[in-house]
Amino acid sequence: MNKLFLFTLLVTLWSVKGFTYEEKKQAFCSLPKVYQIRLLDCLIDRGSENDKEVVNAVYKCMNEHSDVDGKADAMMKAVCNEEIFATNRNLILCMLVNPPKLEHSERTNDDDLEAVKYCLVNG
């Protein structure tokens, strides 16, 4: 029952635009790691090409300069452990040298919100 309540709360957090990025991040980072990874795997699969470029760039650098278990784990650590960038100069340099190649996208915030809702419910 607690898991159902938690997922319902997260769907509400992402659906209501009144919550700040920090509040959403705090809710996400308080999830057990297994649910964070599951949610991120789904979001990566359903993300835009630009989203995938960012994920690939973060994963490449995190994999070279930190201990990660895949793309979702790299993103989870980048979002929930921001101090990793403050304490690892090689990671920062890698991100500066290998920025993601972003292109114009017709994808809207509503498309992203639908992906988040889908992954929170079906993830």
Swiss-Prot record:
Protein location: Secreted
Cellular component, GO annotation: extracellular region
UniProt keyword terms in alphabetical order: Disulfide bond, Secreted, Signal
Keyword Signal appears in the UniProt entry: yes
Keyword Ligase set for record: no
Name of the molecule in the record: Venom protein 29
Annotated organism of origin: Lychas mucronatus
Post-translational modification: Contains 3 disulfide bonds.
Tissues expressed in: Expressed by the venom gland.
Signal sequence, start to end: 1-18
